[in-house]
From Swiss-Prot:
Protein known as: Collagen alpha-1(I) chain
UniProt source species: Cyclopes didactylus
Post-translation changes: Prolines at the third position of the tripeptide repeating unit (G-X-Y) are hydroxylated in some or all of the chains.
Subunit structure: Trimers of one alpha 2(I) and two alpha 1(I) chains.
InterPro entries for the chain: Collagen, Collagen_superfamily
Molecular function GO terms recorded: extracellular matrix structural constituent conferring tensile strength
UniProt biased composition (Basic and acidic residues): 51-65, 778-789
Keywords, comma-separated and alphabetical: Calcium, Collagen, Extracellular matrix, Hydroxylation, Phosphoprotein, Repeat, Secreted
Biased composition range(s): Low complexity: 20-39, 93-109, 127-145, 193-208, 219-228, 298-314, 334-343, 500-543, 551-599, 628-638, 697-712, 763-777, 793-838
């Protein structure tokens, strides 16, 4: 049957996470920042000592020029949705920054090593093997990587893809084969032997011959018992039980019990062709919606400002507890659920499965004894459309893309990447006391901000004192969110017009209607084709023996292409992960091959032969080609020339003897009347339905609704002002946590120079999941997937059952008069008419 609409495009797997940016080659080892002591609670900010001379932090070695970006991961064939940016290891919780000990005097800001040129981010292919992360100076102990944030719960199932537009019902399958002709009633059992005729009366005893001289004739043979009533000739075999009238086609056995729908249960909705092999799981089965990025760990409590260093010099701020930036919870490793891979190409419309085997024809109603074919029972009602096949199975989600390879320890933030879609703005915590303006520690890398679905709003960390604003980390590009669920199915394509009916076959005698095949889904009624002009009536063909009607089954319902399984639940939005680099939106994979259209379900019972369609408008008088002027009817035998005007008495008006009307030239044989346009032969019972026309290509599946726009990713919390990035002085020993001081005034945001990016630290433990943030604004609309290939046209269905003969069209206009026949031979002279009043002398008649 024509293919059901293509299954909705698999939801394009979320774009693969950007491959880890080729890890930046290890930045040269920054001089090791002393390991940060565990960040004690931020002591109350000591009085901001003057910035002690920055102890010389070992000048961060110039970050080695960024090592070559790790080899660009091989570019996945399809641009995998960007592989996860290697999840920048979630910033390990910044080890609690040791209380800002007395900041060692920050060394003078060593010139920040120039940041090695940012390695060209490896093409975020699959994560290139990360270049080895340069050893990072020992960071304060990176908090252990939190367990991956809980994978965001899978979002609610995406809407089931819109059910593809209803494929046009395949053409009505050919009329089911007429049920087997009722079995010809077995010849009735031989009628009971006629009762033996009464034994013939014994022949009359021969009269005893007159007693001739002979002895009386022998007694006439006891009339041999009359022939044994011919043994009642075995009743003619019950006249062969004249096949009972085809049990008036036992009304088509109740449509063969509708063949019980032949249990051909709608052919298993041809298993919706395996959802076209769900195209390859989109490359990199993009990691499922990245498990919602574990909620961003609570913003590590910004280490309390170190206790004032002893010498009141504000100790270098303990490494600005890396702004505690709760490690972006380790982006929970992408929860399983590899996103549905790029929707596989909609499987190419699988070749429509072979028409589901017609379910076994319903049991033939017991064939009534075959009578003369009863009038065809009305065609069984079109069976209901079989239930839609079960939705095609949603192909297994592609495997989650690989998580970026080793999560490097967060390095200092690199240059701020492009701004990912803003995550939901975290609630701004109350400003912590402003710590002394320490030199900024090297900013950690922003974790890869993978745009999750806007995650739940993490609990706002308590913002530490606003440190000087560090340079922005690289803006993570958000991954293009998964394409929204397919919009509602486009409107069903226009119904193709029903083609003109084929020429009527010779009117076969209508075979007894077979049991109605299962009705196919009612084919969309084609528009009745314009009634062709009735052709000249063909001679009524002899009724052919009723051909068996072609099998009716309208093509069973096209197995619905499984309604797209419900999309996997869309994980609830995780907290906005840090916006990762926008994965390149993976190309929407080519639509997965449409699942093969399920095998057409068994033909539905043949629709009842629709009543005669309304009489098509009378076609223009079937001008068959003008019948060639009917062959001149044989020239009428030349009419005897009408009586040539009886030239006898000039007819009145001296029709010279009345000139027979000038012999009406033998009537020219009437121009062979253009036979009335032959009545249209009764439309033979429609010839067996040709194989269903190849279903026009299914109206293109309504355009895939453009994926609803994705909510824009929640706004990124506004980055707190960046503190100036001082060079990280060596961390002093963790001071004892002082009592939290009153929040100092927020220092002006200084802009520090961007420190070199350190290698990514190990991922910190995932912070607890913050409460869900408000849903972020919808993300940008995902790219519309490429239009899937047009499905194959369904196989041409068997010819529809012949339509009932159209009513006889009106006779065509008479053909033009045939040429005037030759003048008939002169008629015999008419009798002289009575002399009319001599009229004016007419023209002399022909000699």
């Amino acid at each position: 049957g024509p293919m059901g609409p293509s299954g909705p495009r698999g939801i394009p797997g979320p774009p693969g996470s950007p491959g880890p940016q080729g890890f930046q080659g290890p930045p040269g080892e920054p001089g090791e920042p002393g390991s940060s002591g565990p960040m004690g609670p931020r002591g109350p900010p000591g009085p901001p000592g003057k910035n002690g001379d920055d102890g010389e932090a070992g000048k961060p070695g110039r970050p080695g020029e960024r090592g070559p970006s790790g080899p660009q991961g091989p570019r996945p064939g399809m641009k995998g949705h960007r592989g996860f940016s290697g999840i920048d290891g979630a910033k390990g919780d910044a080890g609690p920054a040791g209380p800002k000990g007395e900041p060692g005097s920050p060394g003078e800001n060593g010139a920040p090593g120039q940041m090695g040129p940012r390695g060209i981010p490896g093409e975020r292919g699959r994560p290139g093997a990360s270049g080895p992360a340069g050893a990072r100076g020992n960071d304060g102990a990176t908090g252990a990587a939190g367990p991956p944030g809980p994978t965001g719960p899978a979002g609610p199932p995406g809407f089931p893809g819109a059910v593809g537009a209803k494929g046009e019902a395949g053409p009505q399958g050919a009329r089911g084969s007429e049920g087997p002709q009722g079995v010809r009633g077995e010849p009735g059992p031989p009628g009971p032997a006629g009762a033996a005729g009464p034994a013939g009366n014994p022949g009359a005893d021969g009269q005893p011959g007159a007693k001739g001289a002979g002895p009386s004739g022998p007694q006439g043979p006891s009339g041999a018992p009359g022939p044994k009533g011919n043994s009642g000739e075995p009743g003619a075999p019950g006249n062969k039980g004249e096949p009972g009238p085809t049990g008036i086609q036992g009304p088509p056995g109740p449509a063969g019990e509708e063949g019980k729908r032949g249990a051909g249960e709608p052919g298993p909705t041809g298993i919706p062709g395996p959802p076209g092999e769900r195209g390859f799981p989109g490359a990199d089965g993009v990691a499922g919606p990245k498990g919602s990025p574990g909620p961003a760990g609570p913003k590590g409590i910004t280490g309390s400002p170190g206790s004032p260093g002893p010498d009141g010099k504000t100790g270098p701020p303990g490494p600005a507890g890396q702004d505690g930036r709760g490690q972006a919870g380790v982006m929970g490793f992408p929860g399983p659920k590899g996103a549905a891979g790029e929707p596989g190409k909609a499987g190419e419309r699988g070749v429509p499965g072979p028409p589901g085997a017609a379910g076994p024809a319903g049991k033939d109603g017991e064939a009534g004894a075959q009578g003369p074919p009863g009038p065809a029972g009305p065609a069984g009602e079109r069976g209901e459309q079989g239930p839609a096949g079960s939705p095609g199975f949603q192909g297994p989600a592609g495997p989650p893309g690989e998580a970026g390879k080793d999560i490097g320890a967060p390095g200092p933030s690199g240059a701020r990447g492009e701004r990912g879609f803003p995550g939901e703005r975290g609630v701004q915590g109350p400003p912590g006391p402003a710590g002394p303006r320490g030199s900024n520690g090297a900013p950690g890398n922003d974790g890869a901000k993978i745009q999750g679905m806007p995650g739940e709003r993490g609990a706002a960390g308590i913002p530490g004192p606003k440190g000087d604003r560090g340079d922005s980390g690289p803006k993570g590009a958000g991954i293009t969110g998964p394409i929204g669920p397919p919009g509602p199915a486009g409107a069903t394509g226009d119904k193709g017009e029903t083609g003109p009916s084929g020429p009527a076959g010779p009117t076969g005698a209508r075979g007894p209607p077979g049991p109605a095949g299962f009705a196919g889904p009612p084919g969309a009624d084609g528009q009745p084709g314009a009634k062709g002009e009735p052709g000249d009536a063909g001679a009524k063909g002899d009724a052919g023996p009723p051909g068996p009607a072609g099998p009716t089954g309208a093509p069973g319902p096209i197995g619905n292409i499984g309604a797209p399984g419900p999309k996997g639940a869309r994980g609830s939005a995780g907290p906005p992960g840090a916006t990762g680099f926008p994965g390149a939106a993976g190309r929407v994979g080519p639509p997965g091959p449409s699942g093969n259209a399920g095998a057409p379900g068994p033909p539905g019972p043949a629709g009842k032969e629709g009543g005669k369609g309304p009489r098509g408008e009378t076609g223009p008088a079937g001008r068959g080609e003008k019948g060639s002027p009917g062959a001149d009817g044989p020239a009428g035998a030349p009419g005897t020339p009408g009586p040539q005007g009886i030239s006898g008495q000039r007819g009145v008006v001296g029709i010279p003897g009345q000139r027979g009307f000038p012999g009406i030239p033998g009537p020219s044989g009437e121009p062979g009347k253009q036979g009335p346009s032959g009545s249209s032969g009764e439309r033979g019972p429609p010839g067996p339905m040709g194989p269903p026309g190849i279903a026009g290509p299914p109206g293109e599946s309504g355009r895939e609704g453009s994926p609803g726009a994705e909510g824009s990713p929640g706004r990124d919390g506004s980055p707190g002002p960046k503190g100036d990035r001082g060079e990280t002085g060596p961390s002093g020993p963790p001071g004892a946590p002082g009592a939290p001081g009153a929040p100092g005034p927020v220092g002006p945001a200084g802009k520090g120079e961007t420190g070199p990016a350190g290698p990514a630290g190990p991922a910190g433990p995932a912070g607890a999941r913050g409460p869900s943030g408000p849903q972020g604004p919808r993300g940008d609309k995902g790219e519309t997937g490429e239009q899937g290939d047009r499905g194959f046209s369904g196989i041409q269905g068997p010819p529809g059952a012949p339509g009932s003969p159209g009513e006889q069209g009106p006779s065509g206009a008479s053909g033009p008069a045939g040429p005037r026949g030759p003048p008939g031979s002169a008629g015999s002279p008419g009798k002289d008419g009575i002399n009319g009043i001599p009229g004016p002398i007419g023209p002399p008649g022909p000699r």
